[in-house]
A protein has these predicted regions:
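Structural/interface elements that position substrates and couple domains in central-metabolism enzymes
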Residues: 1-211
Length: 211
């Protein structure tokens, strides 16, 4: 059963003619030569930051089936060097199979809109073919004209973490200024709006309490 408060989600789910859910890994692997992996990689704290145990376990399951001629694409957040130094070796028994990185940039409460209208699509791959395939897939899905940033997996892993870190820092800074305003009696909305009007800063993710 799929239930969520995400806008547009239930409408798309109930009107889709092609969506098919299954708990059978074989069915998923046999359905297409392009396999997207979207699982949790929660922040684990410490020096590793992101917990790769779930995605690694899934790659090991796929490897045990010795699939051939597949393009496997990981869409969850990874630490730098995971694709090249961990993930690809977990698929060592999969003949003619590539492993690439295509993380999403969406926020809860705006997932569908963010997916359909991305500012950019980040693709980390060593395969020119995969880069072209993914761009063609997105061109059929998105409703805008995003920038396609195609690079090696390591560069893409660092790009994803950099963007996440920058947005988190911007939100934290806005909340810090909000606290200062509350302490001295200033209007935090007026202050942050004025600061955000500077094109070098911008108002996105720069509002009191924004998370």
């Amino acid at each position: 059963t799929f239930k969520t408060q995400e806008p547009q989600y239930m409408h798309l789910l109930t009107t889709s003619k092609n969506f098919n859910a299954s708990c059978d890994l074989n069915q998923g692997l046999n359905h297409s030569n392009i396999i997207f992996i979207m699982v949790q990689t929660p922040n684990s704290g410490g020096t590793k930051f992101y917990d790769h145990s779930i995605v690694s376990s899934l790659l090991q399951e796929i490897n045990a089936k010795k699939v051939k001629n597949k393009h496997i694409v990981i869409g969850c957040t990874l630490m730098p060097k995971y694709i090249d130094e961990v993930g690809i070796f977990l698929l060592e028994d999969c003949e003619n199979t590539t492993l690439s990185y295509n993380p999403e940039f969406v926020a809860q409460g705006d997932i569908i809109n963010g997916f359909l209208n991305p500012d950019m699509v980040l693709i980390g791959t060593h395969s020119v073919e995969v880069g072209c395939i993914l761009q063609n897939i997105y061109n059929k899905i998105v409703t805008n004209t995003p920038a396609y940033c195609v690079m090696c997996p390591l560069d893409a892993e660092i790009t994803k973490i950099t963007i996440n870190g920058y947005i988190t820092t911007k939100i934290s800074f806005a909340n810090m200024i909000s606290d200062v305003c509350d302490e001295v009696g200033a209007d935090k909305s007026v202050v942050l709006s004025a600061v955000g009007s500077d094109s070098r800063i911008g108002t996105k993710y720069f509002k009191p309490g924004h998370s």
